[in-house]
Amino acid sequence: AQEPVFVLSEYPADAPDRIEQRRNVTPSDKSRYTGDLTLVTSNMTVSAGEIFTMALRALPQTTHVGAPTRGALSDVLDKQLPNGWVVELSNEVYSDHEGQEWEGRGIPPSQRFAVFTGDNPLMTHAALIRQIVEGQR
């Protein structure tokens, strides 16, 4: 991006007043990448990877391919119980630059195809990445 870009917003799910925090990506004044970017995701893309996915999808040079993310991107709220146990509750609601919330659904790519398949999923993943780099996908 040449200028700051709004990429996502977040707010605490249990807040009585919905006060969103808007997040922007601001380009560096030193060096920046402005070329095409292909983002590959799968159901193994989860949590911070999904927040990163939302941020990259807001940039005009990003093409999102692969399979939908897992759909588990909320921050947690820790609560200690009287017996000393700790319970972690999903607490943060994220929405992308278009206002979409992907929690529980996963972020779908614009071009869908399996990323990990067959008897050797790591090899099929490597072959897929090779095809993308070589322009065959």
What are these regions (language model features)?
Residues 16, 95-137:
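Intrinsically disordered, Ser/Thr/Pro/Gly-rich linkers and terminal tails that flank
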Residues 1, 57-61, 130-137:
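Sec-exported extracytoplasmic/periplasmic mature domains
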Residues 44-46, 59-73:
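Short, well-structured beta-strand/strand-turn elements
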Residues 34-37, 49-53, 119-130:
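Extracytoplasmic/secreted envelope proteins and their assembly/folding machinery
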Residues 53, 62-67, 97-100:
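Active-site-proximal C-terminal subdomain of hydrolase catalytic domains
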Residues 1-36, 40, 44, 74-78, ...:
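Gly/Ser/Thr-rich loop/hinge elements
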Residues 53-59, 80:
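Short, solvent-exposed amphipathic alpha-helical segments in soluble enzyme
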